[in-house]
Design a protein with these regions (language model features):
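Catalytic and substrate-binding clefts that recognize carbohydrates or anionic sugar/phosphate headgroups
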Residues: 42-44, 48-100, 173, 228
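Conserved small/polar residues in nucleotide/adenosyl-binding loops
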Residues: 255-262
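Extended, loop-rich substrate-binding clefts of extracytoplasmic carbohydrate-active enzymes
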Residues: 78-131, 223-244
Length: 262
């Protein structure tokens, strides 16, 4: 069964059937900052070593597979419906929505079309800077103005893989989060000068720094409470599990061609 094809011109492998029987991963970064991401945006990022300097979390052998990840959610504020640019974690029916993944040379692009909205999310790590860039583009292909909210989400690691998985009585107090001027900062209390951050090139309309506040009780990345409600809660704390979620409300106007013939 064929799930994709090579795009020789762009030097990409294009996965246009995303319900793969196993994970198809790509490696980002060529120097100190690296990431491993799969065809549905699941994966993690690390600095130099994935054992001692993980930036974002990953749960090996998890169900559903390859969680968590580096996700972007879109919410239609007219009816409360929401989806993710990558097929997972929301997992809209493939009969209702179209998804693609493009694995390139040290970058990956996720594409979706749903309810007259086409969107893309490109993950890449530049050679000169130890950062992961999320390039998100949204286009209104429908015949009406659209009121949307866009949410980012990644789950921060405590840096050491053992701390992420053992002795929660201690590890839940080894990091804290804060928010100021559009920047989420995650501080590691047991590492001198240890911190990581999440920000964007826009003024956010909301944020969440706490994973359990963004996701909500008895929920998963499939149906986060902040996305369902349409508003992040502004959470932060000196302890607990932390995430990077920034919210941006946008109005997508109708597309008009500069040519009167179109």
């Amino acid at each position: 069964m064929q799930y994709g094809h090579f795009d020789n011109e762009k030097r990409e492998y294009v996965i246009d059937r995303v319900d793969l029987p196993a994970s198809w991963t790509n490696y980002l970064g060529l120097k100190d900052m690296c990431a491993v991401v799969n065809h549905t945006a699941g994966g993690y990022m690390f600095y130099k070593t994935p054992e001692y300097h993980r930036i974002t979390r990953f749960r090996g052998n998890s169900i559903p597979m390859d969680r968590p990840g580096h996700y972007v959610y879109i919410r239609d504020n007219s009816d409360g419906d929401y989806w993710s640019i990558s097929w997972q974690p929301v997992g809209k029916s493939l009969e209702e929505a179209a998804y693609r993944c493009r694995h390139g040379m040290s970058y990956t692009v996720y594409e979706s079309e749903y309810k007259g909205i086409s969107a893309s999310q490109k993950l890449s790590i530049p050679l000169q800077d130890p950062v992961e860039l999320w390039d998100v583009k949204i286009k209104n292909d429908s015949d009406r103005k659209r009121d949307l909210s866009v949410f980012s989400y990644c789950e921060f690691s405590f840096h050491h893989i053992m701390t992420d998985n053992q002795n929660f009585q201690m590890s839940m107090y080894c990091a804290g989060s804060s928010y100021e001027d559009g920047i989420i900062e995650h501080d590691l209390f047991y590492e001198e000068f240890g911190f990581q951050y999440f920000t964007g090139n826009f003024e956010p309309d909301g944020f969440d720094c706490l994973r359990d506040k963004f996701i909500g009780p008895y929920r998963t990345e499939d149906n986060p409470l902040s996305v369902e409600k349409g508003q992040c809660g502004g959470s932060f704390e000196l302890g607990n599990n932390h995430c990077g979620s920034l919210q941006k409300n946008i109005t997508c106007l109708l597309y008009t061609s500069p040519s009167p013939r179109d």
